Amino acid sequence: MGSLCEELDVPFSRCGSLLVTYDAYSVSRLEKKLKNGIQNGVPGVRLLSGEEAEAMEPMLKPGVVAALYAPSTGTVNPWQLGIAAYENARQNGAEAVLNTEVLGIRQNGQGFVVETGEDAYRCKMVFNCAGLSADKVQALAFPPSVRLELDGAEYLVLDKNAQKPSLVIFHQAESCGKGITAIPCVEGNLLISGVRKMLGIPFGTTAEGLQELHTAAKELLPDAETSKVIRSFGAVRPNPYTESGESVHDFCIENPAPGFYSFIGIKTPGLTCANELGLHLAEKAAAFLRAEKNKEFNPRREGIFEKDNEIICQCEQITRAEIMEAIRRGATTVDGVKRRVGSGMGRCQGSRCTLKIEKLLEEYRDGAL
């Protein structure tokens, strides 16, 4: 991941992680994860005593029984990484058709026809990476062997000046408790999550759930400054199940017909594995199409570093030049700008800069800029 972020000019922090437990009965789970980590080639992974873990991360509540330490764990801004990969793909000749729903997929004698409300696209191969809807997209052409059920979690984002651990902290849930995750983000915020729930309102939060998250965070990290929350949100992940209702504990890569691949249930650690999955898919495509390696391919992309003296986002110190560069690269909404340069992610959550960014977007669309 570090080398990929370097190529795509995306910030990356290799901070390490601790998976901690306060329950002697859960140590066997850590030992199993240690064995799996060693078998999978995770560098430097080892089991620590409670005293070693507390010395490594003083913010932890005293009483740690054991902890699994993984020094290679890192953090990255997920949407910046995704957008950077998209920009690099465009640099190398890829085309994108955005805001277009797939309504049908059918086979023809030479491959497939992907139908949308506006057009039909004839292709030799289809790669279905539709995330939360991947099973539904495959069902347009072939019966999937797995179905997705969504569950969610609530998240707290703490201000950059809040005290934070130096490592990613995972809490190994005990038999009667719930795990929690605390992530020191590469941007400087602390992200806290882990209260799993079945979905009522997609992407929603509840007062009870957020309070539970506040309480759990303080139990794990007593000095966590949860009063400095600047944002809360809900997120979902796709859990794959077989038709008989059995949970699938791995990624599902389906190949129901020559030239058709579906990636279903790509959840944690999906971001970490995304590049390797992409390389795996590229090898399949090259073999199927008998394609030759593109000698002109350029893996490098330059980040947005344009700056001037006009500050638009006061909280994050984002300049007009940065916002205009994000717009020139394809941002068409305030959220699109936000995910490229970080405007609106600070303490005021965009209350002071949103209208200014909307005006710049409008002027750019009208040709005034």
Language-model region placement:
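Dinucleotide-binding Rossmann-like beta1-alpha1 core, especially the glycine-rich loop
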Residues: M1-M56, G179-I180
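Flavin-dependent oxidoreductases
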Residues: I105-Q110, V114-E208, T215, A224, ...
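Short Gly/Ser/Thr- and Asp/Glu-enriched loop/turn motifs at secondary-structure junctions
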Residues: S13-S17, D151-A153, V341
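Helix-loop-beta segment of a Rossmann-like dinucleotide-binding subdomain
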Residues: D9-T21, E54-N92, V195-G200, Y261-I266
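C-terminal catalytic lobe of FAD-dependent flavoproteins
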Residues: V186, P202-I311, C315-E322, A326, ...
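Helical element adjacent to the flavin cofactor pocket in flavoenzyme catalytic cores
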Residues: L68-M125
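Iron-sulfur (Fe-S) cluster-binding segments and ferredoxin-like electron-carrier domains
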Residues: F203, T319-T332, S351-A368
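Short loop/edge segments at beta-strand edges and connector loops
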Residues: R14, S49-G50, L98-T100, T116, ...
